[in-house]
Amino acid sequence: MGLKKRWRWVSGLLCVWLIGCGGGISEQVRSQVTYSGSFKTLQQEPEKHTGATVIFGGKIIAVDAKEDRTELLVLQLFLDGSDRPEDNDHSDGRFIVRSRQFLDPALYPKGTLITLVGQLEGSEERLIGQRPYRYPVIAPVEIKKWAPRADTGPRFHIGIGVGTTF
């Protein structure tokens, strides 16, 4: 195998490897996670875990940019093997991401999927409609925004005759 062919082959493998590494949270930050329990357990006893470094994901359902901080209200979603939130109807609750830095609502719009590593600051009670709800409050260390996935739903085509499909 010539040097040029070998170089192309190695370059191709390197590109595939780099694309595959374009995942979620950085390994350095992920290694700081100290809480390995479920979101449901943390939500039931947030004071017991205050100060723990957690990793959770979800979908932004509201953004509130205040003078001294930005709050993201997030619907918790389970993470897949790449730390990407699974965008489905399975959730154990909601949490607040409270950042001392300005997070532009145009860059963190409603519906955005995020994964974050952050420190649990405790909890805060707010209303959902008329119902009181206790939100875990997390100060972010790193937030990963996920681009929307292309429609990956099942596709099939059954043709009968000319121009007829189901």
Regions inferred by a protein language model and the residue ranges of each:
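OB-fold and OB-like single-stranded nucleic-acid-recognition modules
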Residues: C21-F166
